[in-house]
């Protein structure tokens, strides 16, 4: 068994508990296509990319493989057409303008683009995301009016800290926002939270999707 396969099996053992379905998104940014193919051989089909150019290249080169691509990077207006073309999921939506561009640019032969609203749960200015419930609700309402987008839930990143109480409080905040949205008439199921260092805590707090890179692929690579 390869190291990569062993890592995937270990993580899936952690996240696949009875009565709890959690999707593993393998963050493959900066890693070569050969690493993605090795992960596919090990049974992994959901992959996350941060950079549009890299997503486009990999999606084209690996088009014959059953991959579900998740865009997890910062959205730029001049690159939304490529995201709309290649991604099945977008985890980082924060602006009405981007939502409308993704909706208008989604190819007609594809199903609606699954989207998550990014929420800043850490309070850190270096992290993206909306910071109050009113703005989250407003954007969610707009997304629901766009036929080529399908709002599924929320995404957030916790602080980079060893303090588990701080991390749990931040994850619980995201979970509470999802509950508020559903109380307001939305029907959302997904919480994308948890990375290599905190995914177990995230699952305890209700995460349905975890984004893990280095724990699977090792440290970042910068070339194929």
Q: In which residue ranges do the predicted regions lie?
A:
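Paired acidic/hydrophobic, glycine-rich loop segments that form the ligand-binding mouth/hinge
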Residues: 48, 210-211
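Conserved alpha/beta-domain cores
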Residues: 1-197, 203-205
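Expand to "…catalyze enediolate/carbanion chemistry for C-C bond making/breaking, isomerization
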Residues: 183, 201-204, 211, 216-223
């Amino acid at each position: 068994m390869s190291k990569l396969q062993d890592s995937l099996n270990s993580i899936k053992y952690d996240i696949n508990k009875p009565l709890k379905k959690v999707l593993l998104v393998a963050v493959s940014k900066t890693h070569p296509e050969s690493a993605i193919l090795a992960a596919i051989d090990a049974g992994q089909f959901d992959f996350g990319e941060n950079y549009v150019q890299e997503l486009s290249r990999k999606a084209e080169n690996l088009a014959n493989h059953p991959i579900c691509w998740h865009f997890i990077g910062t959205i730029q207006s001049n690159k939304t057409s490529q995201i709309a073309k290649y991604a099945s999921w977008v985890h980082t939506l924060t602006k009405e303008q981007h939502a409308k561009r993704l909706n208008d640019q989604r190819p007609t032969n594809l199903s609606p683009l699954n989207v998550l609203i990014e929420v800043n749960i850490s309070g850190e200015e270096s992290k993206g995301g909306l910071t109050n419930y009113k703005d989250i609700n407003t954007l969610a309402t707009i997304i629901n009016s766009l036929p080529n987008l399908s709002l599924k839930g929320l995404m957030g990143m916790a602080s980079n800290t060893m303090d588990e109480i701080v991390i749990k409080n931040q994850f619980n905040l995201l979970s509470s926002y999802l509950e508020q949205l559903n109380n307001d008439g939305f029907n959302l199921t997904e919480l994308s939270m948890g990375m290599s260092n905190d995914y177990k805590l995230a699952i305890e707090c209700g995460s349905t999707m975890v984004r893990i890179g280095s724990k699977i692929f090792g440290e970042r690579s910068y070339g194929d």
